[in-house]
Amino acid sequence: MIKKLEIKSDNKLQNLTSYHGISIIDSRQHLSSIFGCPRRIDSGDKKVTYMWEFVYTNEKGEEVGITLYDWKMSKVVTETARINWHIGSKGKSKAEEFAKYIGEKYNLEISSEDYDL
């Protein structure tokens, strides 16, 4: 269970997380109304355009870094288009915990390749 969730903007998590098959399906506009504006990433390879960074504290008191980002949306995607936003973490269990928490708290649609959230 997540005890505390913070939105970060210090760019420290971008290369420290990876995707574990869990996504949120929603529009940038709706997610921005919940989490504030995402950080725009101007990566040369165009793999990520927008990203939020979070740190949450779990029941054990551990701080966990999470990224939420659009992956390989090379075509122009409108602000209201519903797309898959990848959840990046340092382990699948952390991504699952985050997805379950924000899915329930904000009534967000979660997609998972092999886990029933």
Which role fits each region the language model picked out?
Residues 1-117:
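Residues within mature, well-folded domains
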